[in-house]
Amino acid sequence: MYGLIEHTDEINRLLARYGVKFGIYKNNVFNERLFPFDAVPRIISKDEFDYLERGLKQRVKALNIFLKDIYTKKQIIKDKIIPEEFVYGAAGYMMECEGAVPPKDVFAHISGIDLVQGNDMRWYVLEDNLRVPSGASYPMIARELCRRASPDTFRANTVVDNRNYGDLLRNALDYVNTGGINVVLTPGRFNSAFFEHSYLAEKTGAVFAMPQDLFVEGNVLYYSEYSGKRQRVGAVYRRINDDFMDPMTFRADSLLGVPHIMDAYRAGNVALVNAPGNSVADDKGIYYYVPAMIKYYLGEEPILSNAPTYLPFYEEDMKYVLDNIQKLVIKDVAESGGYGVVFGSELSLERVYEL
């Protein structure tokens, strides 16, 4: 597989030719950049991959039950497995989603779980990313271009094909579809992952729509064609954050949402993929309790461990953090994707005392 390295420049030229881009905002200015390709592969054996798959499925299963529980019965809080302040105080907890249960009870249709392999060669989970995970299209495209640039590499090695993600996503949409077409909903071309939105719409055979293409009537969601004809929508793979999904329910100033889409969702007339309110499970305070969650809901030992984590809510953890802060990475519980990260080794003594 290391034969791919000599094709790095060629693959990057192909990525540029096909316009594989992602966007970033810096100083309130939107810039598009070509997706950077690293030809050095991370080789994972089938046995190791099967182990990871089992662990990830177990974790997502427990998190899915947790999401239904906290928005309905709240049994995990009543049984004092998780302190209520970590649920209700989480930035991602949405009171507007109380009592709302999605079709087939599936909250987390897609997850973007971050893994890291330690010096001990064990795999650890860093983040769960159940809100609006992104990035699946880039390895699919990279694999396609790698095969094109170096077909002999793939003939000589048995490599599992990852290009079936579009089929898997379509199957997930079909499974929860309440009757109607599937839609990929994008906020527009200035979103950082707009390329991916259009790519996944093509690969799933779903209608690629913007918010102005959709409307709700009688608690049913419809897609309006240019001809004026309308089609009922049964499932929406939405790439719009919760706060902006519905100006009638969440942020009233949102220009990206579909008015009353939450009414259609609450009535069980449309599936939203992923379910609104999932971001509570991405909170770093909740992350701390996922191993306990797995034991509580599934009666199983966690297959994959969290990265060693200390929560200053507990006196013992607080003492450890204060004694070892310069060896630790400090994260804001409400942040994700590298935001709000502080490296203890880079802190001045004054900043340590401030924290």
What are the residue ranges of the model-derived segments?
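Preference for protein termini
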Residues: M1-L355
